[in-house]
């Protein structure tokens, strides 16, 4: 069964991701050694607390450590302020909406697990449930291949290695790097719309916010653009509205993903035969 893994740093009292799990499922929270007692006291009855050395560097280093520790397993890494919910189509404007009120029921949670297990069996060794920032219409279907997203990612670590994923090769925006890195090795990515996520406020205290600034973020994006220039392209319009990340030491840059989705993978055809892409 898929193991949910929640990396967390300086967020004792704010791990809202735990709200999505039924009582008979044990998620793991990965923390620095010096925070083990505080997290155990707060969440030890609801999750297993896993430690990594205090010297592990940032979220990219944390994710690399997680992919090392869980080698051979199927995992779903999810931000500590993120929960996965059901979605439904709103007919009046043909918009897919996330259920912001109700968590998954016991049955729905295990249906989600099976849905993604099926995706992995079909060849989707990495994927995510979408954060609905932009409008998702019925024409998008229940999922889309090679569409980028963040806040959560699943990996079949029986099929992918830490080196293949590429965490630790870039300090920030590591999810974007891993997404492109795996696609360019021939591993398609699956973005779910049937299930959407509710996530916490950007730049909340702790976590990545403790190390992120505009300049650090921009240097990471520049590295991604150098390595994947055709798929990670600079966005030049409507970027002035982007909020600053920590210190406003320079204007924030933005990349847009340009990954071809015209030719579907073998994994897509296998998964579509089991779970049709079309909205009911």
From Swiss-Prot:
One of its GO terms (molecular function) is glycosyltransferase activity. The keyword Glycosyltransferase applies. GO terms for biological process: DNA modification. It holds the Pfam family TAGT. Keywords: Glycosyltransferase, Transferase. It is an enzyme of class 2 (transferase). InterPro entries: TAGT (IPR049100). Its EC number is 2.4.1.-. Pathway: Genetic information processing; DNA modification. Transfers a gentiobiosyl-group on a hydroxymethylcytosine residue in DNA. Is involved in a DNA modification process to protects the phage genome against its own nucleases and the host restriction endonuclease system. This is Beta-glucosyl-HMC-alpha-glucosyl-transferase.
């Amino acid at each position: 069964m898929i193991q949910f893994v929640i990396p967390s740093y300086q967020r004792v009292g704010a791990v809202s991701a735990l709200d999505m799990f039924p009582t008979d499922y044990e998620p793991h929270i990965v923390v620095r050694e010096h925070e083990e007692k505080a997290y155990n006291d707060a969440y030890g009855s609801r999750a297993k607390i896993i430690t990594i050395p205090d010297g592990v560097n940032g979220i990219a280093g944390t994710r690399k450590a997680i992919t090392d520790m869980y080698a051979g397993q199927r995992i779903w890494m999810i931000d500590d302020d993120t929960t996965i919910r059901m979605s439904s189509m709103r007919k009046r404007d043909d918009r897919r909406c996330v259920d912001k009120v109700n968590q998954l029921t016991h049955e729905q949670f295990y249906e989600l697990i099976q849905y993604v297990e099926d995706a992995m069996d079909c060849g989707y060794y990495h994927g995510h449930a979408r954060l609905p920032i932009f409008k998702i219409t019925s024409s998008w279907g229940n999922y889309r291949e090679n569409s980028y997203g963040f806040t959560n990612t699943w990996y079949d670590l029986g099929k992918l290695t830490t080196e293949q994923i590429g965490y630790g090769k870039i300090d920030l925006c590591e999810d974007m790097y891993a997404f492109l890195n795996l696609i360019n090795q021939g591993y398609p990515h699956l973005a779910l719309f049937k299930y959407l996520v509710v996530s916490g406020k950007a730049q909340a205290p702790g976590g990545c916010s403790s190390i992120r600034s505009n300049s650090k973020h921009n240097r990471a994006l520049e590295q991604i653009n150098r390595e994947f220039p055709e798929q990670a392209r600079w966005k030049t319009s409507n970027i002035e509205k982007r909020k600053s990340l920590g210190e406003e030491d320079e204007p924030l840059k933005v990349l847009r993903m340009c990954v071809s989705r015209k030719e579907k993978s073998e994994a897509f055809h296998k998964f579509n035969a089991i779970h049709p892409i079309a909205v009911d």
